[in-house]
Amino acid sequence: MAGRRLTWISEFIVGALDSDKYPLVKWLDRSTGTFLAPAARNDVIPLDSLQFFIDFKRECLSKGLHPRDLLGSPITAFGKICTTSRRLRRLPGEEYEVVQGINCRRWRLLCAEVKECWWCVHARTHLHSGSSLWEILYQHSVRLEKHRRRPRPFVGENSDSSEEDHPAFCDVPVTQTGAESEDSGDEGPSTRHSASGVQPVDDANADSPGSGDEGPSTRHSDSQPPPADETTVHTDNVEDDLTLLDKESACALMYHVGQEMDMLMRAMCDEDLFDLLGIPEDVIATSQPGGDTDASGVVTEGSIAASAVGAGVEDVYLAGALEAQNVAGEYVLEISDEEVDDGAGLPPASRRRPVVGEFLWDDGPRRHERPTTRRIRHRKLRSAYYRVARPPVMITDRLGVEVFYFGRPAMSLEVERKVFILCSQNPLADISHSCLHSRKGLRVLLPKPDDNNTGPGDVNLLAAVLRSFASGLVIVSLRSGIYVKNLCKSTVLYHGNNPPKKFGVICGLSSRAVLDVFNVAQYRIQGHEHIKKTTVFIGGDPTSAEQFDMVPLVIKLRLRSVTCDD
């Protein structure tokens, strides 16, 4: 029976305490649910007080509890059943108190969710709603800090620690002329090019890249050190010749350059391939297998055939494709099913990797990873729910709350808590209901309406409005403003200074978004003579923010920092 939440136990105990039928069973503090009951350590207990435990035992048998759970004395069975079902808890400290010569134990009644109570049903989600709103605001503040700390790309940013003297352009080192190019060592001219494998060509020779009159020395003047006076002039203006581009524009430009070079190579396939790729003749003559110069990025038809014969593969192009290495990493090799039958001859990693037809330069999803219509609609709904116009400053501020029933003040207090729920309470519930417990200040309950705090109006209308306000409002008071999440299904209106388009206009409080109903920055801009508080209207549409006598429930929220400015 441990862990079973038997609400009828709490109802029986509360009814017995309120009836005053048993003299030694009485309340210590009804607001906290503490009471006294005779303990089992007494030798003699009055019969009128012992009758409480006998009636409790009969109630347990009528509710279907097994007799073996009621073994022992009625007082021992009472303590065992109430503690194992989590209905009672012993008070810490002094457990016993002597009343009329009888030792009485101090008990605390634990709350429970009553299914028949409308307020207990909605109180179940209050803890999650409060923590989720605080997490939403915290994520927006962290996102703003990351956006501020994000380094913007600029000319001269180092992409690698080994190339400190060379400026970077879209994570690609830019080739410089002069004495700095001599430090490349054994890397070869191909390692100093951009990702597309294209080297700058002079405008005079752009129309005839394949002409061999001037040789590679005119098209690759950066591989030879120029005179000292020219070096000084060129290095001084190297930043002036470069243009600052963002990542997307730079990648798009490189993509078009790569396409043009591909078309150019296909159109001039009869020319010298080494001459077209821009490799100096002295490098070609001295480059031998195992030498210092790295020319692994260049794949020719001869090298493909030689590697195929050495590997014993009949298909020459397949062998070259297996051994070719993509230095820049910008092209994806695709082998059709006609060339390879069921992946024969390919390594296991190549068979597991999905084949992509085209390369996507942006960071968007692939074709097979694009979301469906249902996911898109769900993301739009969640983005609207978590949308916050201005990122908050996560510093808690004290908030003043004023409540009016038909224009008459019903409650006024100050809340100093990072998040709380303002809701109504069940006027007929007892202390055993979970909706009457504040959960350490999380839940702030509106007072019960009576003749002293209710103005001239329809009492039944006020009762219906308070019933619809059982879920309440989640409120977070920060130095940057007041943030509210509406949990009510009924129509809720508010009058505040945010958004600026609806300044001074009574508008609806959406239940699908977190709204900044009062913004401190907007208050500073408008001046101190304008709106200083936010007014929430529930159950009626007022003619103005000052005349709300005919509205059943009105709540005014005001920050302490704004009050101190007056």
UniProtKB/Swiss-Prot annotation:
Residues 151-170, 176-236 are annotated as: Disordered. Plays a role in the inhibition of host immune response. Interferes with the transactivating potential of cellular IRFs IRF3 and IRF7 that play a critical role in the induction of IFNA and IFNB genes. Additionally, interferes with surface major histocompatibility complex class II (MHC-II) antigen presentation. Interacts with host SKP2. Interacts with host USP7. The keyword Transcription applies. One of its GO terms (biological process) is symbiont-mediated suppression of host antigen processing and presentation of peptide antigen via MHC class II. This is Viral IRF3-like protein. PROSITE patterns: IRF_2. It comes from Human herpesvirus 8 type P (isolate GK18).
